A protein has these predicted regions:
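Conserved alpha/beta enzyme-core scaffold
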Residues: 1-299
Length: 299
């Protein structure tokens, strides 16, 4: 079944108030074009979850689309903090459930396996857990090991309404390859009710079938496939393109203040009709070709 659609069509399938799991990790494989389209369509009151908060989540928060975030902390890596997320937390405009990265993966894993809860040693005795129990008291509990009697922290499973995963290659049926680190993406997909795949390359199914062990997302879990080159810009996609350091610096500086963020959104999100106009605004292929990955190094 051919599931290839436009980005606009895929985003339109997400209702207000949905829980969306994002594949991004700091400044790598972040779902940036997706986040921008969510803002252009005016979708609101989202719950966003990630193992490590990335630039896509910060953009969504900066645009007012998020009411709750579940994450293991996050940053723009060497370029600084997630300024919009941090400001929203300080202002109280979003609820932040902060976990360790491991415990976020465990919550997705529990959801993927259909478990009622998952025991974990992580978080015990930390201020992270103390704060988490204040903002999300139903997310954790304590259980006794029936074999040893030991006391364990238990986490509630996560089952996002949709996982949005940025990949390097997919076929029209939704079978997808991810090169390089996959982090929690497989657990996100298996835990979610459905998945939107955003791919740099769209290839015939015959290509995927030639090397089936590379397939980490299987088509039966996928509702939409979006073929959109440079859709993670300005973040990096291994073996496709490197991060755009100049643009991330521009974003990081703009995001420091509400006024700066509004100006950024007006120019790069609301000032263009779609991802293609955004790429042209950056300078088109004259600008993007310098980011294309070295075929040997992968970046």
């Amino acid at each position: 079944m051919d599931k290839a659609v436009t980005l606009s069509e895929a985003v339109a399938s997400i209702p207000n108030g949905a829980h969306v799991a994002l594949s991004g990790f700091a400044i790598t494989r972040a779902t940036m074009a997706f986040a921008a389209e969510v803002l252009r369509q005016g979708i609101r009151d989202l719950t966003v979850s990630q193992c490590v908060g990335a630039m896509d989540a910060d953009l969504l928060v900066g645009g007012g689309a998020v009411s709750r975030i579940l994450y293991g902390g996050g940053s723009l890596d060497r370029f600084g903090r997630l300024a919009c997320v941090n400001r929203a937390i300080e202002e109280g405009s979003i609820v932040a459930e902060e976990y360790s990265s491991l415990s976020m993966v465990f919550r997705y894993l529990a959801g993927a396996l259909g478990l009622p809860f998952v025991p974990i040693r992580s978080l015990r005795g930390s201020d992270v857990l103390t704060h988490l129990q204040e903002v999300a008291p139903s997310a954790t509990a304590y259980v006794d090991d029936p074999f040893t009697g030991d006391r364990w922290l238990a986490l509630r499973p996560l089952n996002p309404d949709v996982a949005v995963i940025q990949v390097q290659m997919a076929d029209p049926e939704g079978n997808a390859w991810i090169y390089g680190p996959r982090w929690d993406n497989e657990e996100q997909v298996k835990a979610a009710k459905r998945t939107i795949v955003i791919t740099e390359q769209l290839v015939p199914t015959e290509i995927i079938r030639r090397d089936p062990e590379r397939t980490v997302i299987h088509g039966f879990r996928v509702s939409h496939v979006v073929h959109l080159p440079f859709s993670a810009h300005p973040t990096a996609v291994y073996r496709a393109y490197d991060y755009d350091a100049d643009h991330i610096r521009l974003y990081a500086e703009a995001a420091k203040t509400p006024e700066g963020m509004r100006a950024y959104l007006d120019k790069y999100v609301y000032g263009v009709k779609d991802h293609w106009e955004y790429l042209e605004l950056l300078g088109g292929m004259r600008h993007l070709t310098r980011l294309v990955a070295d075929p040997v190094l992968g970046y």
